[in-house]
Amino acid sequence: MNKEQLEKMKNGKGFIAALDQSGGSTPKALKEYGINEDQYSNEDEMFQLVHDMRTRVVTSPSFSPDKILGAILFEQTMDREVEGKYTADYLADKGVVPFLKVDKGLAEEQNGVQLMKPIDNLDSLLDRANERHIFGTKMRSNILELNEQGIKDVVEQQFEVAKQIIAKGLVPIIEPEVNINAKDKAEIEKVLKAELKKGLDSLNADQLVMLKLTIPTEANLYKDLAEHPNVVRIVVLSGGYSREKANELLKDNAELIASFSRALASDLRAGQSKEEFDKALGDAVESIYDASVNKN
């Protein structure tokens, strides 16, 4: 583990850019960027277009390591290059800590939750991540209803996989998303917090994790989890809120920083000039940084 990157993730001022839309969500991300499905004829072309978009983001002067602590990449992005370097090396050289999305998507809903599908190639994927100088990973589950068994299952699965990731020398981001429209969202979050605490308490002193959570209904609910000795940092997802709304809610949570995807890229368009693109990205970065650093 890179100690300098660990220090940056633990104490740095800023947020994490989530650039990890995978195959399933790529057409939607491209469409929002202004590229329709009739502009590519196969998956290779689609992934090339999305890599071009990500390259445009990470090479922009607005994508500044003074504001952006880390970036989460999709597996394809890890194996591609930006300006002649593998993406993770390009980011690390720029001062941005690289993470890799490792999950294979969500299973069918059961007990009010969606567990992760099995990650059958996890070992070899983590070996490749180490070869590509990746610092940490991210994997997402989804909680839709107040169901204690379901929430327990989500957290247990996350920690089980997290321990395999830690054993390979990487820092896992555990992401049990709570759907922002869930009927009993505040109650779900209390149950989730208790289960997360159990999981964290089961770790050895040298087993470090990060958490990526939905912004809680009750402000500062996760403050004591953020102070847990095994937690490097807690980041939050935008989860379907507009950027303005997500930023506003984030400002009420002292220890939390953003890890936004859609909310970061929502004003970026393929047809923008370099100046327009850099300004749109810069405005987004500035507002998300502000919500992550300057609290109410």
Swiss-Prot record:
Which EC class heads this enzyme's classification? lyase
Q: Keywords, A to Z?
A: Glycolysis, Lyase, Schiff base
- Which InterPro entries does the record match to this protein? Aldolase_TIM, FBA_I, FBA_I_Gram+-type
Among Gene3D superfamilies, the record links this protein to:
Aldolase class I (3.20.20.70)
**Active-site residues, Swiss-Prot/TrEMBL:** E175 (proton acceptor), K212 (schiff-base intermediate with dihydroxyacetone-p)
Which pathway does this polypeptide act in?
Carbohydrate degradation; glycolysis; D-glyceraldehyde 3-phosphate and glycerone phosphate from D-glucose: step 4/4
One of its GO biological process terms is: glycolytic process
Which reaction is this enzyme known to catalyze? beta-D-fructose 1,6-bisphosphate = D-glyceraldehyde 3-phosphate + dihydroxyacetone phosphate
Q: Does the keyword Ion transport apply?
A: no
Give the molecular function GO annotations. Answer: fructose-bisphosphate aldolase activity
Listed EC numbers:
4.1.2.13
Family statement: Belongs to the class I fructose-bisphosphate aldolase family.
Q: Which HAMAP family does the UniProt entry name for this protein?
A: FBP_aldolase_1
* The protein's name: Fructose-bisphosphate aldolase class 1
Corresponding gene?
fda
